[in-house]
UniProtKB/Swiss-Prot annotation:
Cited function: Has a role in meiosis.
Single biological process term from Gene Ontology: meiotic cell cycle
Region Disordered, annotated ranges: 232-336
GO cellular component: cell division site; cell tip; cytoplasm; endocytic vesicle; exocytic vesicle; growing cell tip; plasma membrane; plasma membrane of cell tip
Protein name from the UniProt record: Meiotically up-regulated gene 33 protein
Length: 336
């Protein structure tokens, strides 16, 4: 069993059970340990003994026996002590509850239960109520035997402090269990939703380039042949370090290459720089500083972007008709 956050609580609860056993093993069950002693009379949880003569195990003391052998020397009356003696049965009841808490703390060391905060809540609740029960049992011991109280009665008080420390340790163990549960849920979620780099480890052979014609059925055997219409030579004539211009296609009936159809880039007209940033209006209208007029500018919409306008088509029907109208016709009727 691994050492967990509930291990200190388990050790303290075992010590508390030992103290409860010492407090219960009193007359008439054992003659050596006593909760209270007056002369030759020794009192325990379930009875009393006079020298070697002990009473039968019972709940509560006989009032006649107290009047005869233990009437004087106590701070409380015989009636109060006789009624309070019935409350001594709370000591074994508190010991049984402490035993239940100890068994549950042992189960708290199991992997699944160790991550359950609710399980620690149950143990803490049982221990919390047992603290009050043990405290009541000690008060009854004081009322019954003071000032002749013996050290086994003080063990009941020690169990009150031990169980109080156990309660604080259970709160710490519950906090640790909450963290373990959250960590376990994160691992489970990341394993199902997250990317696992080892998921393709066993299927890495799908990327192998080895031939699989031997283990494939006949209907799945295939072969890829070069099509007949593919007449392009594999050797394009371009060697490493050669010029890329060799790959530019040209027309058979035209000596112009594709580079001749590329649009010409107009260089901007250089504007002379003035010495100062401020210029007068008459200095801004110099012809040298004016940009050339854009031939593609629309006079009706001068602020329109010429790039968005369609390029002029010199082979349109309207332009062809306009050019034909401008040329003089050579057709004549009759002979010249």
């Amino acid at each position: 069993m691994r050492i967990r956050s509930a291990t200190p609580s388990l050790i303290l609860l075992v010590i508390a059970i030992v103290f409860f056993v010492l407090a219960i093993c009193t007359p008439p069950l054992a003659n050596n340990l006593t909760l209270g002693k007056y002369g030759d009379v020794r009192f325990g949880v379930f009875g009393y003994c006079l020298n070697s003569n002990c009473s039968k195990p019972l709940v509560g003391y006989n009032s006649d026996y107290l009047d005869e052998h233990a009437k004087d020397g106590f701070r409380t009356s015989v009636i109060v002590r006789q009624r309070a003696s019935y409350g001594l049965v709370i000591v074994p009841v508190s010991a049984c509850i402490c035993l239940i808490s100890t068994i549950m703390t042992i189960f708290a060391h199991i992997g699944a239960i160790a991550r359950s905060p609710g399980f620690f809540n149950v143990i803490g609740t049982i221990t919390f109520f047992n603290i009050f029960i043990t405290a009541i049992a000690f008060v009854i011991c004081v009322i019954t035997f003071v000032p002749h109280i013996q050290w086994p009665s003080w063990l009941v008080l020690a169990n009150v402090g031990i169980q109080l420390i156990v309660l604080l340790l259970l709160l710490v163990a519950r906090r640790q269990a909450t963290r373990l549960q959250a960590k376990h849920l994160r691992r489970a979620t990341s394993g199902s939703l997250g990317y696992n780099p080892y998921s393709l480890q066993n299927s890495s052979n799908i990327f192998s380039t080895s031939s699989r014609k031997g283990d494939l059925p006949k209907f799945s055997d295939y072969s890829a042949e070069k099509p007949m219409y593919d007449t392009i030579s594999e050797d394009d004539g371009l060697k490493r370090g050669g010029s890329v211009s060799k790959l530019k296609p040209t027309f058979s009936n035209d000596s112009r290459s594709l580079s001749s159809y590329a649009p010409t880039v107009r260089e901007p007209v250089p504007v002379p720089k003035s010495n100062s940033g401020f210029r007068f209006p008459f200095m801004r209208n110099k012809p040298a500083e004016q940009a050339p007029e854009n031939p593609f500018r629309d006079p009706e919409n001068p602020f329109k972007d010429p790039a968005s306008a369609p390029a002029p088509n010199p082979w349109s029907i309207n332009d062809v008709q306009a050019n034909n109208d401008k040329k003089p016709s050579r057709f004549s009727w009759g002979r010249s």
